[in-house]
Amino acid sequence: MWINRLVKHPSYSVLRFYTKRLCTVSVKSLREFGVLPNSTICHSVYPRRTYVMGRAVINDILIKKSYSTHTVCAIDRSKDENNGSAYDKFEAKGIPIDVHTLKRIISSSGMDESEFSKSISYLFAKTVDPEPKDVLSLEDLSFLLNKLYTQRFQIRRICRDINAKYSEFWFKLFSLYAEKVDAKRNQVNLRNTKLDACEIFDANLMIKNFIELGQLGKAQKILSFILDRNPDILLSPKNADISTIVHFLQLRCGALAPYWKIPDNSEQKQGFLRKMVRLGAKNTSIRLSSTYKAMDHQTLLKIADLALQEKRLLNSEDLLSTLIQSFGHLGQTQILERCIEHIWQISPQEFPSHVVIKHRGCYPSSKILVSILVSFYFNDHDLHRGLSILDSFIKHYPDVKLDALFWRRLFQLSHFAWTPANDKKATSVVRCWHLMKQWYASKRLRPSVDYETLRQLYDIMKKTGNFPLGIDVLRSFKPGIERMRAENAGKVNNIIIKYQKCIIKELVNRGRFSAVREFIDNYGFDRKMTKDLNIFCANRMFLRSKKMKNKIENKKEREKVRLDSFDDDEDDGMIIGSLW
């Protein structure tokens, strides 16, 4: 197997001028279609920028499932034969792979390597080039890998339908890709050369895929595949690759906040240890790598030193975000504070509001603020320090955009930090809710709906009995909920129905029947849901009346028993008195 042949090879810059393969296949095609100017290929000053732009344009085009004839006519094509053939080849590449072909390829992943290689060749002939090829080139396999990645969600559904292992299919595909890389270097006597930019891009794409699946062990193997062939890809000022550094920090330095175990104070019971939870939505299906806990402290400090000096690294939002999470996971909060102060001039000591702050790196984003918030909570087990720094960011960087993920993490952490014994009404969580509404109102935006945020707020409403909070949530999120129901009604309906039933139950129990009718009229969303809510409301009202009736009858019965016992005592007293 290829994994046994992974050895370290000295090699040179990953960011060198790109290989003949990239120029002839990617950029040349783009030039023929009029997407890039003719001077792009010969431009040797910014090869990395040319490569990234070309790859981005290709991926953007491939995602589009169909190409209309009107679009075809709109493209300015030359009449010569070369441009025509290039366009035809491009048209073939733009067609998505059909379900039958995908099923055949996925089923073949359980076979040996030679049979799987033949199936991949069949896939290439079916979708790109009808001419049969016994052995695919590395360029062809690279294209198929990227194309399959754009259809990964469809592939996952097929794997579920035919009972195939989704992650094993991708790892088998990468095994074939790695063998092609070694075979190419053996043929042209380039065994000691580094991976080129396209090969690094493909490998990082696979790492990203396995991290999304929670298959960190497989992601670690692919990362080793890159590092063994490109030893200077992390710490060289000229050759450092941002995607590889990000994946190294995630896999070797703990910069995967959704997988961190966070103490949940809201579920703590007296005499028991606190429950540990993960922030990720699918935390129960995560398979952590055994090497995930083997943290590389020294390399982290070297990467941080390089990142704080190199402008292109400071401008990377992903790199700074993972760097912050790495320091947070390793408990280096003092270094984290110094990094934040160096890059954005924000410190725990409050600056006067009139001080002008200039950032040295990228403008703070929602992703960076989430990393800061989670990192400090992970070490402090409360939100005081994180919210203090967050408040300074919002004050001195008013254009920062806070997306749905930021508010989701804020509600999760505020919920976990909530201690019911000290705060029965969960005022800290409710305060975060009002903060979110105020921020969206100041930006004149509608709050973006997030399923996990809805779930967190529902738990707070149910535990505290704060049904006005639930009504306020439905009122604020109503336009977004309607959009979500149009896209995927099944998942969002479950949590919305919980809100509705809990609120109706509370209103009925308090005898506010007119408020119940008004609530159903405003938040029924459709006829079927309104009908179901009316039935549920009628049942609750019947149960309430029955309960009240039983309560009155029981009260009368107790009163009657008390009077009877009083009469008996009076008779006994009269008898005893006459005896005396």
Curated annotation (Swiss-Prot):
GO terms for molecular function: RNA binding. It is found in: Mitochondrion. Signal peptide: none annotated. Its main location: mitochondrion. Residues 1-40 form a transit peptide. The keyword ATP-binding does not apply. GO terms for biological process: regulation of translation. GO terms for cellular component: mitochondrion. The keyword Mitochondrion applies. InterPro entries: ATPase_expression_mit. Keywords: Mitochondrion, RNA-binding, Transit peptide, Translation regulation. Binds to the 5'UTR of the OLI1 mRNA. Belongs to the AEP2 family. Required for translation of the mitochondrial OLI1 transcript coding for the mitochondrial ATP synthase subunit 9. This is ATPase expression protein 2, mitochondrial. It comes from Saccharomyces cerevisiae (strain YJM789) (Baker's yeast). The gene is AEP2.
